Curated annotation (Swiss-Prot):
Adenosine 3',5'-bisphosphate binds at residues 83-88, 164, 172, 279, 285, 290, 293. The lineage of its organism: Eukaryota, Metazoa, Chordata, Craniata, Vertebrata. One of its GO terms (cellular component) is Golgi membrane. It holds the Pfam family Sulfotransfer_2. Residues 1-11 are cytoplasmic. Disulfide bonds join 201-209, 222-228. This is Heparan sulfate 2-O-sulfotransferase 1. Its EC number is 2.8.2.-.
Amino acid sequence: MGLLRIMMPPKLQLLAVLTFGVLMLFLENQIQNLEESREKLERAIARHEVREIEQRHSMDGSRQEIALDDDEDILIIYNRVPKTASTSFTNIAYDLCAKNKYHVLHINTTKNNPVMSLQDQVRFVKNVSSWREMKPGFYHGHVSFLDFTKFGVKKKPIYINVIRDPIERLVSYYYFLRFGDDYRPGLRRRKQGDKKTFDECVAAGGSDCAPEKLWLQIPFFCGHSSECWNVGSRWALDQAKYNLVNEYFLVGVTEELEDFIMLLEAALPRFFRGATELYRSGKKSHLRKTTEKKAPSKETTAKLQQSDIWKMENEFYEFALEQFQFVRAHAVREKDGELYVLAPNFFYEKIYPKSN
C-alpha cells in the first residue's frame, strides 16, 4: 500500500479512496436490502402457513361451534424481556409443541416496539381469544403486559415470564447490539463496529450504558399505561409488583432457569411435559450466547448501583426472586443435590351427602 501511494498521483489516490468508500456503502446497503427481503419473505411464509391451518380446520366454513375441553382452551402468553435467556426457553416450547399438541406463535411487533397501539391491542385480544384453530396456544414476543379483562374478555390467558439481574441484562444487551450471538452469527447488528467495552462506555458517560437503559423489566410488567414508561416512576414499580403477583402464573429468573422450567412442567404438563429433561440434555440450554461479552468491573458496577433507577429495577428483581423462591420452596424438595417435584399433598374427605 505504501508503494502504491508513492507511484499513484494524489488525485488518483483520492479517487481510489472515494471509490472504495462508495463501494463499501453500496455493499452495506445491499446487505441491508437482503436482510429486509428475508424478513418480508419470512412474514409471507408465516401468513401462508396460518391460512393453510385455518383452511384445514374450517370444514367448508360452516362448522358448528363446539365447546373446547378445558385442556384445549388454554392460552399462554410469554411477554419476554430481551436478554433474559428468552430464546433458550422459547426454543424448548418449539421443540415440544408437536409432541404435546399445541401451537407456538411469535408476536412480531414493528421494530420490537413493546407498546401496541390501542387498535392493535383490541385486534390482538380479540384474535387470540377467538382463534380456535390455534388453541391450545403459546404466544411469545417482546410486548409489555396487556390486561385482557379491560377488553371484556371472559377468560384471561396465562401469563409467564423470566427476568434477570438488571446490570447483567444490560451488559448482555450492550454487547449483543455490537457483536451479536452464536444463534445468528452472520447477521449485521445495529452497533456493529463499535469496539468500546461496557466499562469504557460507562466511564465516558455513553448513552447506550446510561442508567436509564436499565429501565425495562419494570415497564414490561407494568403494562401499557403511560406512567409505566416514565423512567424512575414509583407508581410503575408498584404496578409491576402488583401484576407480577396477581396477573402472572409464574415468573422465574434467568439465574435459576432450570427450576422455572421444572415448576412449569409440574404445574402445566399439557404444554411442558418433557421440558426439564430437554433442558438438561443441553440441546437447547443456553442456546443463545452473546459474543465478546466482558463482565463489568467492580468500579463500573458500583457506579451504576448509585443510580435511583438501578435501585428500583433491582428492588423489582429481588421482589420477583423472593416470590419465585417462595413458590419453589412449596413445590419441590432437594435430595442429594437434585430437585424433585413434590407429590400431591391434599385429598378430599368427609364428603356429604353420602351416596346410596
